[in-house]
Each structure stands twice: as structure tokens, then as C-alpha cells.
Amino acid sequence: MKTTGRVNGIISNIVIVKADGPVGQNEICYVWTGDTKMMAEVIKVIGDAAYVQVFDSTRGLKIGDRVEFEGHMLEVTLAPGLLSRNYDGLQNDLEKMDGLFIARGSITDPVDYDAEWEFSPLAKAGDKVTAASWLGEVKEQWVMHKIMVPFTMTDSYTVKSVAEAGKYKITDTMAVLTDAEGRDHEVTMVQKWPVKQAVRCYTEKPRPSRIMETGVRPIDTFNPMAEGGTGFIQGPFGAGNTVLQHAISKQADADVIIMVACGERANEVVEIFKEFPELIDPHTGHTLMERTIIICNTSNMPVAAREASVYTGMTIGEYYRSMGLKVLVMADSTSRWAQALREMSNRLEELPGQDAFPMDLSAIISNFYSRAGLVKLVGGQTGSVTFLGTVSPAGGNLKEPVTESTKKAARCFYALSQGRADSKRYPAIDPLESYSKYLEYPEIREYLDEHIEKDWVDQVYAGKTIVQRGKEANDQINILGDDGVPVEYHERFWKSELIDFVILQQDAFDDIDANCPMERQQMMYKMVLGICNQEFAFADFEACSQFFKGLINLFRQMNYSEWKSEKFEGYRKQIEQYVSEQSK
């Protein structure tokens, strides 16, 4: 019998409930006000008083209103039909909702229970299976969606029977499994899993050993992201966080993209809704929306649901990872998720940490980031979840708690600089502040040596040194004036500008320059580095700046030319001739 209770106190969206039976931490309940039922989550239990966080506005709620406890945590529905859907943080399908604003208590089905799917069996009677073992598959968009033993079935089972190939609804029985005690268990295409728990149905979690191409030069060349890795973009408002995330989501070498718009402005989310169904995925030739799931909690939606949306996105990512797919989960912005945690902590009157964030903020963020990763599945295949979050601290403050905690958890850091954004150097990734710890991994070094070029990491560090020395030379020029420093200082500065303009800047709105394949990046970078390592003889600083401005212009035209086209090769020859005329 389910536990029930009555509302005993209200603090904004935290409701104190006097329960008449046992209540668990993180248990889901429904609070009734009139004919409307609102979902809520238990966040603290003291005696017979349960503190529940309501995922809707509590306006009109009164003392004595009825509460029903469900006996399970916040769960997501995992089944074929998730791809190309738009959900809110509680996995309600936004397309099925009417009106400009979401009505209070709106609950819709996350998947279509009446749709039929073409099933092909992969297992056979007599096979031994465990949680996440593949029983069959259906074609969802262009992805082969595996039907698995539910993650909750943790024992070892023997397959008694599997459905024959044909069309089935997701609620039909696909297989019957027998446990060690001889009991039969029916398995359908649908399963549920609590969002706060990591899916651990794999045999091994090795270190990342491959890079994930994004087509964005300052990331792939200077600070690569590993497949199954973690990273975050930090930058003040207006520095291009969202445009960079959209560029990565369009071009990343992943099978499934999950975008979590957590506390984002509504117009940025609408942009994704409008653009993605029209854009073509360069890897498959299908529309981008076919491989994308959007989980959206905009700024004007309830704060409590923001926290849930990030976990919902990660859980769906882990589900697709269990099918042996490469998944990219992107959250914009985790700062607003942390603000939701702060609001909850403050209402519970917990001891505040720095800037009133919860004391355990660092542990919460680290625990969440640890759910990403490359895994070896029970069948021997590999799957991965790569996580990329954004942090938007007030005033671009790098020392605030969310940035500090995320830096400890994530292995890649992309710092967007206000100065670079103001001077229109997009993407505004600061080459000196940003880093990728994956460059230190022997596995990644081996991969880069084998797939790009021998000693590639050393060449990357050489480029970073040129940029650093150019910045130092620029500081000296600004202090002493153009005539007050040797011409070598100007040469050093302009070499760093060459790397900046050609490699670190990229036009996200140009069809060709927006997506730069790794082969092209390697060729361009080698060319630029070769010029930077040459010695030139300039009469004065004006001759130096004129030469490099002309060179940068040729390279920029080359960036806008199609890879290996006549135009591209023409610019390459022009550059070689231009440089040879000036060389010592």
C-alpha cells in the first residue's frame, strides 16, 4: 500500500509533508491542489516530516492538501522513439503540450506507445544473459536501437524464448528470461531507470584512448577532447558559449547528441528547435535532428526541474552508450544547475559554503562528471559518453565556486575570453588559459602519433610557446612603443598573430570554414608552424607587419576555400612563393 500524507508547511517550492508511513530519500510523490497533481521529490526526511521539492509553481497550495508517495525515485523511460524528441527536465514531451506556456501539472508520455517497430532478434533460446545484454534490435532513425535486458535485472539469466522478426509495439513481450531459481521474467522494449543513479552495466571503464573530432580548430588542434572525456566551456555572457556549443553539436563525430538546455534563454532553445531539423549531418547525410535529443528547461521554467534535466540527459546518454554508440552530452549551462542546488540548499537552511552554494558542491559536480566515460560492454563492444558543459559565472569570474569545482572534475577547460570576444576573435577560446589534460595521456599521444603525425603533441606545445612569446612581445611593444623594441619583437608578435588568425579563429557561419576536418587542420597547422620556425630579415617593423598582414590575408582566403580544390591549391602555391621571396 502506498504511503500518503498531508501538507504541513510551505516554503516557496519546498513543501513539508506529514507522512503516515515510510518515505525514502529522493522518492517521487504527487501533491494535489484541487484537480491538479504536481510532481515532487523528497529531499530530506526528519521523523514523520518529509521535505519535498515541487517541480511546479506552488501557488494556491494550502495546508492539509493531499500528497501521494510513489515508492520509487525520479525515473526516465528508456525505449525506442527517444531520438529527435524535445523534452522538459522531467521527460515530458514538449511537442504534445498545447499553449505558449506549460500548464501546471502537465504530464505527457515520453514515447509513443502505439507505434510499431521492426524487430530483429540477436539472442537465441539457451543464451546466458545479464543486465544490458542485447536481445534484439530495431531501427530508430538511422541508429540500430538495441533491445536490452533491463538494467534493474542484476542477476544471471537464461533466455527461454525471443520474439521472431516482425513488427511489435514497445509494450509487447520481446523475450522471456529464466533466473537461477526457475522463475520466468518477461522483457519488453521499455525499461525505467532512476536518473540519480549511474548505469554501471559494463565490465570495464578504461581510460580514453581516442580523440573526438569536433571540426573546431582551436579545440581539435590545440586542446583536443577525448572520446569518453569530460570538458567545460567557461566564459562571461556574450563571449560565444552557445554558438560554440551549437557548432560542436552540429559537427562532432558522435552517433547521438543530447543537448540539455538547463536554465537557458528561450530564444536560444528555439534556435535549436528551428535549425536542427533543417541542417544536414555531414557524417550521415541525414538531418541533425535525427540523431539529437533536446532536454529543455528555460529560465522561466521551475528552478527545481533544472536540477533534474541534467541528470535526465546523462541517464539517456548512458542508455545509448550501452548500445555501443558514441554519445555526446552537452549541458548549457551548469552554472544555472548549481544555482538550483543553491536555492534548494538555502531553503532547507543547510550550512552555506562559499557564495552560499552547498558545502558539498564539489562532490556533486565531480560525481556527475564521473558518469561520462568510455566503457567496455558485457558483450565485448565499446561505447562512450563524452560530456561537455558550460559555466557562465557572473562577470566572467574564474575564481567562483562552480568554476573551481568543475576544473577539478573536468579534464578539458575552454576559457572564453571577454577581450577576444570584444575584438571579434571567434571562437573566443583563450589559447593560454585553456588546456586539455588528455595531451598528457600516453594512450592519446600514441593515437595522435599514429593517426595524425609523429610527435604531434610536441608540435602543439611548440605552437603554444609561439603564442605565449608573442603575447610577451606585444606587452613590451605596448610599453616601449613600436620604435622602442628590436624588429625581432615585432616578428615574434606577428608569428603569434599568424597562428591566431589562421588556426585559432574560425567562422562558424561559413559553410566551409565552420567544419574543418582533422586532415585539413594537420596540413594547415604544419604549414603555419613551418613559417613560424623560419627566420626573416625585415628592414623595420612596418615591413614586418605588412608582410604578415599579406600572409594572413592569403591564409584566410585559403580557409574559405574548399579542401583540395583548385582555389585552395592556388592559394597554397601563392603562400609558398610569398614566403620564399621574404626568407633569408
Kindly give the residue locations of the regions a language model identified:
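P-loop NTPase nucleotide-binding/switch module
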Residues: 97-152, 169-229, 244-247, 282-299, ...
